[in-house]
């Protein structure tokens, strides 16, 4: 009888530990779309795109691209909170924090559905997201 009680208590304890957060490894890395929030709108002949970059994260300036089909479309930086960063993989590079805003001339781009925005960023803790691709509209 004593052995049965020990077995039942051990089983119960094992089940408790297995279901507790102690053994569960939950990801603490948020999705890219939650830390690099992209929005866009059309204002006359300009397309304006902005990123809200959450605290503790940054974008690589040189990763930001606007493309239509395979062609890179030039853009103008309206606002950026840039700084120089020494990256172990990319060397000295410009990064963006907080807000980043660009404008794209819309005079020749009538079909906005084919425009893609590409960007890549990392967390201050060292996790880097793969290149992100988002349709403009």
In which residue ranges do the predicted regions lie?
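Extracellular/lumen-exposed scaffold segments
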Residues: 2-4, 13-137
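Sec-dependent N-terminal signal peptides
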Residues: 6-8
């Amino acid at each position: 009888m004593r052995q049965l009680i020990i077995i039942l208590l051990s089983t119960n304890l094992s089940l408790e530990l297995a279901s507790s957060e102690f053994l569960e490894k939950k990801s603490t890395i948020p999705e890219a779309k939650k830390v690099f929030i992209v929005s866009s709108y059309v204002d006359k002949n300009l397309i304006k795109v902005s990123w809200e970059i959450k605290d503790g994260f940054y974008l690589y300036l040189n990763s930001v691209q606007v493309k239509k089909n395979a062609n890179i479309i030039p853009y103008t930086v309206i606002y950026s909170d840039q700084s120089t960063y020494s990256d172990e993989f990319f060397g000295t590079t410009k990064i963006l924090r907080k807000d980043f805003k660009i404008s794209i001339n819309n005079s020749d781009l009538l079909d906005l559905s084919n425009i893609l925005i590409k960007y890549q960023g990392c967390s201050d803790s060292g996790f880097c997201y793969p290149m992100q691709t988002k349709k403009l509209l």
